[in-house]
């Protein structure tokens, strides 16, 4: 696995904390968008105390691209004062083909790319997954209930390709990569479809966010993680990593899943990462975990990654 051109080692690889544990709208109805710098600092202290040196300002927590420039600069200064860098920005449930808000989210995507350039982030993650349905919001684990599906319509597929290509060209001008998040029932919802989609986009800076955890957690038949990873590895870019226990009863068809620490779930990340490295993978990671103290589990996952990534 020696690669003398690799830009990071296991000690220096950028491994960011996700902010999925923290909502944008707080219990009192106020928004993180309007918090003071001191209030932001209280939240980010959790990230620092968990040992992270990288942060993904996930837009389910804070929409940096929608902050006034002066407020954004205040946020960036705060992160630097806390010893945090921001290698990437992830977007969530703002699909550029949303039937109601697609145009709005496309414009937002361009602002995210500009914001990434302004804060020094080299990666942005986009997806085609829609808002949670009411039934999903009521479920203990939202992925056990079917959500919004991308239409099986060639015209919408072409529109999605065109819009991601547009964003990709913008990002390319700024030296930024785009990673499209694997998520069920979307155009990036299987390995085969994801590869077909990024191939149709046809830009070297547009690849796949190989978030296989989003698929193996489903209570339905899914392709085994290993052939999925083999297909997407040549296209892997900024990578959301999480894992799940998965039990399948072949006689009854019962499937049960539950969030797991990265090293314990059904996906062997030592093997998966080696597949990606063999194809030159050199993008940051994002650690995320649902349930319990997800930030602390993500910190343990970060430490696991540092044990299995290349020494040099």
How does the language model describe each region?
Residues 31-34, 132-144, 247-256:
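Short, flexible, mixed-charge acidic loops at enzyme active sites
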Residues 34-36, 58-71, 94-105, 131-135, ...:
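Acidic-and-aromatic substrate-binding clefts and catalytic sites of carbohydrate-active enzymes
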Residues 54, 123, 238, 283-284:
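Residues at the N-termini of beta-strands
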Residues 284-290:
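Short acidic/histidine-rich active-site segments
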